[in-house]
């Protein structure tokens, strides 16, 4: 029963998700977590960070109280599940959330990002990501450092973004080879 848990940070940090379970190897896990009650969780920092084999169905989780998703899927190289219906309206930090992901290209266009303040390195080395996020509300974002750096495929319009409160965009598109959009 996970209904009372508020902090899931680093829960599966560098865990091996596969179809082998051994009591001698604590890091191995392949249980179904799709029905976990996440309704009281506020911190998902690094929850699946480095879990390179994780690709579980977690799209129905109620994460409406979560405020921090820093490095949530950082290095979860095969993760590519539908999380389009996640309520991220209370999240303030999504830095490194999809960094070093090789497969993620989910539709997250309708996420309510109005409370997010930091998007640093959000898609840093995000190999497959090329979804349209032009409708995101960035009115509270302060920092977007290296947000799309080293993305391989990203080339979507961002002309609807209000970046008037952003104070740091250092290296935002550094080595984003495909990006070629009008930012005027």
Question: Language-model features: where?
Answer:
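Negatively charged
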Residues: 1-184
């Amino acid at each position: 029963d996970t209904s009372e848990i508020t902090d899931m940070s680093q829960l599966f940090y560098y865990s091996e998700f596969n179809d082998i379970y051994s009591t001698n190897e604590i890091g191995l896990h392949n249980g179904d977590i799709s029905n976990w009650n996440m309704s009281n969780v506020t911190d998902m920092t690094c929850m699946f960070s480095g879990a390179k084999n994780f690709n579980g169905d977690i799209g129905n989780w109620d994460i409406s109280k979560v405020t921090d998703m820093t490095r949530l899927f950082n290095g979860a190289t095969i993760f590519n599940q539908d999380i389009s219906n996640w309520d991220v309206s209370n999240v303030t930090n999504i830095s490194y959330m999809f960094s070093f992901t090789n497969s993620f290209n989910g539709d997250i266009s309708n996420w309510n990002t109005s409370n997010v303040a930091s998007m640093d390195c959000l898609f840093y080395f995000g190999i497959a990501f090329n979804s349209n996020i032009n409708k995101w509300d960035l009115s509270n974002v302060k920092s977007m450092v290296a947000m799309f750096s080293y993305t391989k495929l990203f080339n979507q319009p961002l002309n609807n973004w209000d970046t008037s409160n952003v104070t740091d965009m250092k290296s935002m598109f550094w080595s984003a080879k495909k990006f070629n959009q009008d930012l005027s």
